[in-house]
From Swiss-Prot:
Organism per entry: Synechocystis sp. (strain ATCC 27184 / PCC 6803 / Kazusa)
Protein name as catalogued: CyanoP
Compartments in which it is found: Cellular thylakoid membrane
Keywords: Lipoprotein, Membrane, Palmitate, Photosynthesis, Photosystem II, Signal, Thylakoid
GO MF entries: calcium ion binding
Quaternary assembly: Monomer. Present in about 3% of photosystem II (PSII) preparations. Purifies with partially assembled PSII complexes, in addition to a small amount of monomeric and dimeric PSII, and trimeric PSI.
PANTHER family per record: PSBP DOMAIN-CONTAINING PROTEIN 7, CHLOROPLASTIC (PTHR31407:SF16), PTHR31407
One of the protein's GO biological processes: photosynthesis
First-listed, main subcellular location of the protein, grouped into a coarse class: membrane
Lipidation (S-diacylglycerol cysteine): C24
Keyword check for Lipoprotein: yes
Family classification: Belongs to the PsbP family. CyanoP subfamily.
Signal peptide extent: 1-23
Length: 188
């Protein structure tokens, strides 16, 4: 009888804790999978239900792409660019400087097809590794609005950009998830 009561109590506490964590964080860790690239030295969590996309023939520097199986225009990508090996992220400027430079590069390269607006730029330090979180609103083509959240850092002479993208009208729905996923990105 005592064992049955104890087992029931453990199950109830576990369920209550999982509901509480999901309600507080908006995303249960069980709903995320880990991706690790040991060659380039980075890893991140991505949502269950997202699948890898073949990047053969993609733009230079695109290392990996995942997209949602259902919301097909929600995706994440990792883009790697070479930089001098002695450069750190802070050598490239503040989060706002780097964010504006990315925005200008996108806007200049798109020939009017894509216009990005920097909404927010923040820096975070994890054990001496600096990351910039950059948030953009992007207007694509004929008034298609998108929302991007990027985490940027340097590692081994490379600038690594981890970017999540969704339709603007889905942003409020996925913001908590995207924040969790972007924060999970780190290099080693």
């Amino acid at each position: 009888m005592l064992k049955k009561s104890l087992s029931t109590a453990v199950v109830l506490v576990t369920l209550l804790l999982s509901f509480t964590l999901t309600a507080c964080g908006g995303v249960g860790i069980a709903s995320l999978q880990r991706y690790s690239d040991t060659k380039d030295g980075y890893e991140f969590l991505y949502p269950n239900g997202w699948i890898g996309v073949d990047v053969k023939g993609a733009s230079p520097g695109v290392d990996v792409v995942f997209r949602d199986l259902i919301e097909r225009d929600e995706n994440l990508s990792v883009i790697i660019s070479e930089i001098p090996s002695d450069k750190t992220l802070t050598d490239l400027g503040t989060a706002t400087d780097v964010g504006y430079r990315f925005m200008k590069t996108v806007n200049d390269a798109s020939q009017g097809d894509r216009q990005a607006e920097l909404i927010n730029a923040e820096a975070r330090d994890e054990d001496g590794q600096v990351y910039y979180t950059l948030e953009y609103r992007v207007l694509v083509g004929d008034n298609v609005e998108r929302h991007d959240l990027a985490s940027v850092t340097t590692n081994r002479g490379k600038l690594i950009t981890f970017d999540l993208s969704t339709a603007e009208d889905r942003w409020d729905t996925v913001k908590s998830l995207f924040d969790t996923v972007a924060s999970s990105f780190h290099v080693y």
